């Protein structure tokens, strides 16, 4: 606020208004400034607080002013005066018994006389207390609360020596002190703080109004609010309480006297001392809390007193009360609050919508409303309620069509009291959030309706006594009809769904279950007709009663561990039947076909033979259909059979089969051609618990294989006899209901009975499965147990359909309880395959327990698969050939095993190593030990083998590695030891491969110490690199340490040629914070690598920099916007200040600065010489002219300026000394002397203080006194002498200053020279010559140091006070020494700069340019063919190198071009490979299409065959039906005639010619299937070639990728030479892998071809069987022979085709491989050349970089480094050639092994 801060405000007319007046306007405190400030118009009360005018509160209230003591109040009282002594009369009489009257009673001095009056002789009246009374009280009692601002008391006598002012705001009940006044505050009011007050409410004691002067008309003034103290909140309650008063009291506590009353107690003396007060002014105003601008007389106060400040406020802002301290009656919506400036805090009217005229304020309501409204209306009318009468009373509601202020806004509710809540109460108003609708009745829980007059749906019986209104319908909701009321609203009767019953609709009808919300209420039980015992189910769960081991709600599922038997479950195998001389034909099962038989195989039944089946364990008495499974021997074979059922006894008439006649047990059957199952014409009735014998007899058979070849007859093959229950006779099919008829129709339509015809089960229609399950449950009374054999099955559970268990390998049977044909050894692991050798065994079957195969002559073993001991060459076994020195040989190769007598070889035909001789000779061929020098087994045998020389007949030893000599008796070069001693041997010298193995002196022959280490190694084993080298000595890879001198520790790297790095890794010893193998770069977040002392931290500001990194050369951090400086901790460029607070732009005159950046902390501009000023915009001291043309002043200015500056300095020092003397006294520099004198004076005092003073003490005192006087004299003389010396020193100092002025001018000139040199250094600093830069920097540091010393010498000022007389001499010596040193340093700097300039001019780039660009570069760029440094082409790009230039740049460009060319070649090879891959894919696609066409032809033939068979079957069934019809007894002639007519009407859909032609086409198609072999053989060849081409393309692509990587390596020029060797080794490994892949592919091709051949042969065999023109089958032996010959032919054909495919594949693979290999070799040669060139470039680049860092001194060493690298590359090339030769030998060996494998040689 302005008045609190001391800022002047302005009034209405704009005049300056002091803060006192503003405070008066705000707080009614105008008295303090009333005398100084004229009255202003007080603003109205409409915009804020308003206050009444301020005046004297005593006016009109004289009767309310009292005093505790008044003179002459009871009788006249004399008094005297002490002032106006010139007057004759000194004593007077006081008579205050009557009021004062100037004419009648002028001696009355009552307290009412102090009220201000403006009479001309107002000093004639005053108040006076009684004589000598010190404690007097003056008190004003006001009729109301007032604001009190200040008081003024004017005394006629002395002002009181002590007094205090008090106030009361509660009409005198409590008092508080305003201020204490006292001449002696400590004595009168102890503990009260002294004035001035620090805070506006401090109670202090003030002394300035209690002085004894003046003796009359002295004033005491007190202001409540001190204008010098700021007030934070003028509207605070503490300020208001401080100003508010109802009573004011002044306590006078002590009189001022002249002191005579203390010595003379007479009454006359006391008559002079009393209190007399001319005037008392108490300023204030009516206290209205800012709610009134005027006041009226209070009750009982005079109404027309002129100038009276009345006490009753004329309230505004809707307030009332004497002080406006309350709100008006109907304005209680807000809490009462004093008005404030800018806020009236007016009381707000209550909102009662016209329904009330009174209200009250409720603070709780106000707080709950968020301090918005607190008024509560009282006595709401018109049926309203609420705080604002805004609601309707209970049982009334708000009419939405009328305004709330309408008296008829609330209407009575219209609700049925029986069905509504609260006796008919409705919603009083609308509220969408709460769901209230005005006038809406609130019904009971079970009542609805606009008036709540009816029951809710589902309830009935409306009653007023029911708290919920209605009763709930006792109906089950699930069984009740939906969509309406569930019961009658009056009676409660329930409405049930169609399938629901019960009083409450809570039960299902019989045969139904699951009461639910469905449309019908319940669901049918739908129990399975066969799996359930009863059609009724559980009403709650729907569970039907199941037969044994049937589960599911409907009993339609089989329990786990049980199964539903197939219709052919009752099967009896022919192999287990009885008969005379029955021949069992076993049949092997292949993995590629589904068996068409059951059991082991078949029984051959010849004409006239009989087989007997024993039938037991039947499940049910019923009719069973008889099925006979058989297999014809020729395609058109037929047979006639007779089946006789032999019962155990006569059939009882009461049994289920009582209707059976004896002739019914003899049944004739006919086996038709091309059928596999015979269904006998009629079923037989059998009963459980009985044993039946069914005898089957073959009565006749016939057929032919060719029209010209009659059938010779070989019987038929019988598989099994099946008793299939005739399920159609079951009640589920034969019942007369609609469900039974539908089940029968479905069973017949989908031919569900065909499940039991064939052993192989095809998927049935989904409609058959539930019917078969039900029928099976009826026949077998539920499900049957699996009974899986625990040894032969994988699980105890079986297939629920049919009961087939999961068998282990080689195990068959439903229960997995027997070995399959061709397997043996039934046990926990299943059965093992016989695996009889087809070459050595007579049959593929073996004995079922032991697995022994039936061997041919000469074969041996369990599987007849090898020769006997001493023979080989299975199956053509022959004796072993071992020269009598072995008993066994290899069964396949014939190589002898376990040769004796030191022999070896395949036939024991040679001696083993270490022996010699010829064991093939019958005599004298023994193997003898080699004498090298002793034989094997001794400790001195050092040869691998030996032989006898044919010419000299001497034994020649083949020494082991490390030995030499005729008998291997000496150590070879590179080895050491003494083999001549027993146990001695030669050992390889452990030299880590770093010696010449052919050098005899490479190592010591006795100790093995290495003597001639190679490859920069040393040590006793050449196992360490020499000092200055690093690497792995064992790998011959010691390289010279390449350390950057700038980043390397100089103690570990004194020179470039001798740097001690880590011998293993080559890591150089880096300076602090330097990284890199060569110490050539700073660590992250460090910079200044070129300092030679390590790198410095970036120290980037953590928040003002973008990151911790900086420029590695300049150290500049990457700053955020708005920040600058090296570390981003300063303001940005051309700014200054604290970046954390504010940055300001540099305000510098660009004409007067030497750099644009000002001082970053102070903003001072950096002025050029001769310029000064804050902005560098004026001439400096010592310069004249008009800026910017500033010129140095005359030379005399410097002398006079020095004198002036010296005088100014002396003046400042003298001023400082004066301040020190003022603070510390006169001691100063003579403090020690004064302390000495003080000590002696102390001794004198001690002597004087002594009681017993002796003569000696007195003499000692006199002596001390004389000593003191002498010391004082000497000190005075010393001071005089020092003052004279000081004058001399000042004179000499002036002369020295004059000399220093000249020296300063010289220093300025030197600074100018140094700046010029600094500019030259900046120019040289941007060059790339580090050595020159270091020298210049060193010189610059020396120059800087010299400048610093010169400046120190120039500006040093000696102190004349602290130094003695020799200061001048030392100053002259110091200046002389500095001048000589400066001259010497300056001369040295000039000489160094001269040398540096000369050296800089001699530096040439021609050598470097020639090495890099190929030309010296001394010619102009326009004529230079190779360019160079600074040359650019037409496009502005740097030009270096070109055609005919042999520099490093040209060489690198050439290598880059070659690499790109290589990359293009590789890309082209990849494109070609992609083409090959596409052709391979096309070939494979064509092969697959051919195979698909062949398969389609085969499928079509099979389909045609199936159609023919189906037609035949239908024809046979038709004939059989006709026969059955004709044989029936009830057939009448008309029916027979009708059937005959229909039979005759049947027409064949084709003529005999069409049938013949169709048969010919089928035969032709079948014959054409023979070409499938050729087609697929060619196709397989194409596939193999395609796969081989694909593999070749993939290998070529992989190698191309390898070459591409190598090309990228060359292009980058960063890989090592060893990568070439690694790539070559990888190529060799790739070739080996490719060869192995080729071998595996060949094997896979052969396997696939063999499988395809077998499949085609099988297809051809089946086609020949189907062909009508095939030859008839021969006898079994002839058939077996034919099959064997056919197999041999097939094997031979397959072998020939394999050889042909192998030949073609080898030719193609060989050609492709040679092509790829040649291409890879060419690419490898190019890559090796490019790598060698890249290695050369890298070494040259390293040499150039190192030469530049070492001041171009190592250019001579590049040639040596190049030659060394050339030699190393030659070694690597030789190693690579050796690896390539090794690769070729490995490939040859692999090819040889492949050939051997393919030819089986």
Swiss-Prot record:
Pfam families: EGF_laminin (PF00053), EGF_LMN_ATRN (PF24973), LAMB1 (PF23219), LAMININ_IV_B (PF21199), Laminin_N (PF00055). Residues 564-780 form the Laminin IV type B domain. This is Laminin subunit beta-2. InterPro entries: EGF-like_dom, LAMB1-4_helical, Laminin/Netrin_ECM, Laminin_IV_B, Laminin_N, LE_dom, LMN_ATRN_NET-like_EGF. Found in the basement membranes (major component). S-laminin is concentrated in the synaptic cleft of the neuromuscular junction. Residues 1-35 form the signal peptide. The alpha-helical domains I and II are thought to interact with other laminin chains to form a coiled coil structure. One of its GO terms (molecular function) is structural constituent of synapse-associated extracellular matrix. Residues 1413-1445 are annotated as: Domain alpha. Residues 1684-1703 are annotated as: Disordered. Glycans are attached at residues 251, 371, 1088, 1252, 1311, 1351, 1502.
């Amino acid at each position: 606020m302005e008045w609190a801060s001391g800022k002047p405000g302005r009034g209405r007319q704009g005049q300056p208004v002091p803060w006192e007046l503003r405070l008066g306007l705000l707080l009614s405190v105008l008295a303090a400034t009333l005398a100084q400030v004229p009255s202003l118009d007080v603003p109205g009360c409409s915009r804020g607080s308003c206050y009444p005018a301020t005046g004297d509160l005593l006016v009109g209230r004289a009767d309310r002013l009292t005093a505790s003591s008044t003179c002459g109040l009871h009788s006249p009282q004399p008094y005297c005066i002490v002032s106006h002594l010139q007057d004759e009369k000194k004593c007077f009489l006081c008579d205050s018994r009557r009021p004062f009257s100037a004419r009648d009673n002028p001696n009355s001095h009552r307290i009412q006389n102090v009220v201000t009056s403006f009479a001309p002789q107002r000093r004639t009246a005053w108040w006076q207390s009684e004589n000598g009374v010190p404690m007097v009280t003056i008190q004003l009692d006001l009729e109301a609360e007032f604001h009190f601002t200040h008081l003024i008391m004017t005394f006629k006598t002395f002002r009181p020596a002590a007094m205090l002012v008090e106030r009361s705001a509660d009409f005198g009940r409590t008092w508080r002190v305003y201020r204490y006044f006292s001449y002696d505050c400590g004595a009168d009011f102890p503990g009260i703080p002294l004035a001035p007050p620090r805070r506006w409410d401090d109670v202090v004691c003030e002394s300035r109004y209690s002085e004894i002067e003046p003796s009359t008309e002295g004033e005491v003034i007190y202001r409540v609010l001190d204008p010098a103290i700021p007030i934070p909140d003028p509207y605070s309650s503490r300020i208001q309480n401080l100003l508010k008063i109802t009573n004011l009291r002044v306590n006078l506590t002590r009189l001022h006297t002249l002191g005579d009353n203390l010595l003379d107690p007479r009454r006359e003396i006391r008559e002079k001392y009393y209190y007399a007060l001319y005037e008392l002014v108490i300023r204030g105003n009516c206290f209205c809390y800012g709610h009134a601008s005027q006041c009226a007389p209070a009750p009982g106060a005079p109404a027309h007193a002129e100038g009276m400040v009345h006490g009753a406020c004329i309230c505004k802002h809707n307030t009332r009360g004497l002080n406006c301290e309350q709100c008006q009656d109907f304005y209680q919506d807000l809490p009462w609050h004093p008005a404030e400036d800018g806020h009236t805090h007016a009381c707000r009217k209550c909102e009662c919508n016209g329904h009330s005229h009174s209200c009250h304020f409720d603070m709780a309501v106000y707080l709950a409303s968020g301090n918005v409204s607190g008024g509560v209306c009282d006595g709401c009318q018109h049926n309203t309620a609420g705080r604002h009468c805004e609601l309707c009373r209970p049982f009334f509601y708000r009419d939405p069509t009328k305004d709330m202020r309408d008296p008829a806004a609330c209407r009575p509710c219209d609700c049925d009291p029986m069905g509504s809540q609260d006796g008919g109460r409705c919603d009083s108003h609308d509220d969408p959030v709460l769901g209230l609708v005005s006038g809406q009745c609130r019904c009971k829980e079970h009542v609805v309706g606009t008036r709540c007059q009816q029951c809710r749906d589902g309830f009935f019986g409306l009653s007023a006594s029911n708290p919920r209104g209605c009763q709930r319908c006792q109906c089950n909701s699930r069984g009740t009809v939906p969509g309406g009321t569930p019961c009658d609203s009056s009676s409660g009767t329930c409405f049930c769904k169609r399938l629901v019953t019960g009083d409450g609709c809570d039960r299902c009808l019989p045969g139904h279950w699951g009461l639910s919300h469905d449309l019908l209420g319940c669901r049918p039980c739908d129990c399975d007709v066969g799996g359930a015992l009863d059609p009724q189910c559980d009403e709650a769960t729907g569970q039907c009663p199941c037969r044994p081991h049937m589960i599911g709600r409907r009993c339609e599922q089989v329990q786990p561990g049980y199964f539903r038997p197939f219709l052919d479950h009752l099967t009896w195998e022919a192999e287990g039947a009885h008969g005379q001389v029955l021949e069992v034909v076993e049949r092997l099962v292949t993995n590629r076909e589904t068996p068409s038989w059951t059991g082991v195989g078949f029984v051959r039944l010849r004409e006239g033979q009989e087989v007997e089946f024993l039938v037991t364990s039947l499940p049910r008495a019923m009719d069973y259909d008889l099925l006979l499974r058989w297999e014809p021997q020729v395609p058109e074979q037929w047979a006639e059979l007779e089946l006789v059922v032999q019962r155990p006894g006569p059939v009882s008439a009461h049994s289920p089969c009582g209707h059976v006649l004896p002739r019914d047990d003899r049944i004739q059957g006919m086996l038709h051609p091309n059928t596999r199952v015979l269904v006998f014409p009629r079923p037989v009735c059998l009963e459980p618990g009985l044993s039946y014998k069914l005898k089957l007899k073959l009565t006749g058979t016939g057929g032919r294989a060719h029209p010209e070849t009659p059938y010779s007859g070989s019987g038929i093959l019988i598989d099994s006899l099946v008793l299939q229950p005739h399920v159609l006779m079951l009640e589920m099919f034969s019942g007369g209901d609609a469900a039974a008829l539908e089940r029968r129709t479905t069973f017949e339509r989908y031919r569900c009975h065909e499940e039991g015809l064939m052993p192989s089960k095809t998927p049935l229609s989904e409609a058959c499965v539930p019917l078969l399950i039900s029928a099976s449950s009826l026949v077998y009374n539920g499900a049957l147990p699996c009974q899986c054999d625990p040894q032969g099955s994988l699980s105890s559970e079986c297939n629920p359909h049919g009961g087939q268990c999961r068998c282990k390998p080689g195990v068959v049977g439903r229960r997995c309880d027997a070995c399959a044909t061709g397997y043996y050894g039934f046990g926990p692991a299943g059965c093992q395959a016989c695996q009889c050798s087809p070459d050595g065994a007579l049959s593929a079957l073996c004995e079922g327990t032991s697995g022994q195969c039936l061997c041919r002559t000469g074969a041996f073993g369990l599987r007849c698969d090898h020769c006997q001991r001493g023979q080989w060459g299975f199956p053509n076994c022959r004796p072993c050939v071992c020269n009598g020195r072995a008993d066994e040989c290899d069964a396949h190769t014939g190589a002898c095993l376990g040769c004796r007598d030191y022999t070896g070889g395949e036939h024991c035909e040679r001696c083993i190593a270490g022996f010699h001789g010829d064991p093939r000779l019958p005599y004298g061929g023994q193997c003898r030990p080699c004498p090298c020098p002793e034989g094997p087994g001794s400790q001195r045998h050092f040869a691998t083998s030996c032989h006898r020389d044919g010419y000299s007949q001497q034994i020649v030893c083949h020494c082991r590695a490390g030995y030499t000599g005729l008998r291997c008796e000496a150590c070879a070069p590179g080895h050491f030891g003494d083999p001549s001693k027993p146990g001695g041997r030669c050992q390889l010298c452990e030299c880590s491969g770093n010696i010449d193995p052919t050098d005899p002196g490479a190592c010591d022959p006795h100790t093995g110490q290495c003597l001639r280490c190679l490859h920069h190694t040393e040590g006793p084993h050449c196992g360490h690199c020499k000092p200055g080298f690093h690497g792995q000595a064992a790998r011959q890879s010691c390289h010279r340490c390449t350390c950057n001198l700038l980043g390397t520790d100089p103690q570990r790297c004194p020179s470039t040629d001798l740097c001690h790095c880590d011998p293993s890794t080559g890591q150089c010893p880096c300076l602090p914070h330097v990284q890199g193998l060569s110490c050539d770069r700073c660590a992250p977040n460090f910079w200044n690598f070129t300092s030679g002392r390590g790198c410095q931290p970036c120290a980037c500001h953590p928040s003002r920099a973008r990151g911790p990194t900086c420029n590695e050369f300049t150290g500049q951090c990457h700053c955020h916007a708005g920040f600058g400086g090296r570390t981003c901790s300063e303001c940005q460029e051309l700014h200054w200040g604290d970046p954390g607070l504010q940055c300001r732009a540099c305000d510098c005159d660009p004409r007067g600065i030497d750099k644009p950046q000002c001082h970053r902390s102070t903003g001072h501009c950096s002025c050029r010489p001769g310029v000064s000023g804050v902005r560098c915009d004026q001439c400096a001291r010592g310069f004249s002219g008009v800026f910017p043309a500033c010129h140095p002043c005359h030379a005399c200015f410097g002398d006079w300026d020095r004198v002036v500056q010296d005088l100014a300095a002396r003046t400042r020092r003298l001023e400082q000394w004066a301040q020190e003397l003022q603070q510390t006294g006169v001691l100063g520099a003579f403090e020690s002397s004064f302390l000495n004198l003080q000590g002696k004076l102390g001794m004198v005092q001690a002597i004087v203080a002594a009681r017993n003073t002796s003569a000696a003490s007195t003499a000692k005192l006199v002596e001390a006194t004389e000593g003191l006087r002498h010391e004082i004299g000497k000190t005075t003389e010393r001071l005089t002498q020092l003052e004279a010396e000081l004058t001399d020193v000042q004179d000499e100092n002036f002369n020295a200053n004059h000399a220093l002025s000249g020296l300063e001018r010289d220093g300025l000139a030197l600074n100018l020279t140094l700046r010029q040199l600094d500019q030259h250094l900046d120019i040289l600093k941007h060059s790339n010559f580090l050595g020159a830069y270091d020298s210049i920097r060193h010189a610059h540091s020396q120059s800087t140091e010299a400048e610093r010393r010169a400046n120190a010498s120039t500006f040093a000022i000696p102190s004349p006070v602290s130094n003695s007389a020799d200061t001048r001499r030392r100053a002259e010596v110091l200046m002389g020494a500095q001048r000589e040193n400066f001259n010497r340093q300056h001369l040295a700097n000039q000489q160094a700069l001269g040398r540096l300039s000369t050296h800089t001019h001699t530096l040439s780039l021609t050598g470097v340019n020639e090495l890099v660009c190929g030309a010296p570069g001394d010619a102009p760029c326009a004529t230079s063919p190779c360019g160079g440094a600074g040359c650019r082409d037409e496009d502005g790009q740097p030009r270096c190198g070109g055609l005919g230039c042999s520099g490093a740049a040209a060489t690198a460009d050439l290598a880059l071009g070659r690499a790109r060319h290589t990359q293009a070649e590789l890309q082209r090879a990849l494109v070609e490979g992609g083409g090959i891959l596409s052709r391979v894919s096309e070939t494979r696609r064509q092969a697959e299409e051919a195979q698909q066409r062949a398969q389609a032809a085969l499928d079509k033939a099979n389909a045609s065959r199936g159609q023919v068979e189906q037609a035949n079957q239908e024809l046979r069934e038709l004939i059989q039906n006709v026969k059955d019809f004709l044989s029936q007894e009830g057939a009448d002639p008309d029916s027979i005639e009708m059937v005959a007519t229909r039979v005759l009407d049947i027409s064949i859909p084709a003529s005999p010619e069409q049938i013949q032609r169709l048969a010919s086409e089928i035969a032709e198609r079948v014959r054409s299937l023979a070409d499938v072999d050729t087609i697929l053989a060619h196709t397989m060849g194409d596939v193999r070639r395609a796969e081989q081409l694909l593999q070749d393309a993939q290998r070529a692509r992989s190698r191309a990728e390898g070459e591409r990587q190598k090309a990228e390596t060359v292009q980058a020029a960063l890989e090592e030479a060893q990568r070439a060797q690694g790539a070559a080794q990888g190529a060799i490994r790739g070739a080996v892998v490719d060869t192995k892949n080729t071998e595996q592919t060949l094997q896979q091709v052969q396997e696939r071809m063999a499988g395809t051949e077998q499949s085609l042969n099988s297809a051809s065999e089946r086609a020949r069987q189907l062909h009508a023109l095939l030859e008839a089958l021969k006898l079994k032996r002839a058939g077996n022979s034919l099959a064997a010959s056919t197999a041999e032919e097939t094997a031979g054909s397959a072998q020939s085709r394999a050889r042909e495919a192998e030949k073609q594949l080898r030719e193609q693979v060989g050609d492709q491989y040679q092509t790829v290999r040649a291409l890879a070799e060419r690419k490898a040669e190019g890559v090796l050349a490019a790598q060698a060139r890249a290695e050369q470039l890298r070494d040259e680049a390293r040499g150039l970089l190192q030469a530049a860092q070492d001041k171009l001194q190592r250019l001579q060493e590049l040639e040596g480094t190049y030659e060394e690298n050339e030699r190393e590359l030659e070694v690597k090339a030789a190693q690579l050639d050796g690896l390539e030769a090794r690769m070729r030998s490995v490939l040859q060996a692999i090819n040889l092994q492949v050939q051997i494998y393919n030819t089986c040689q």
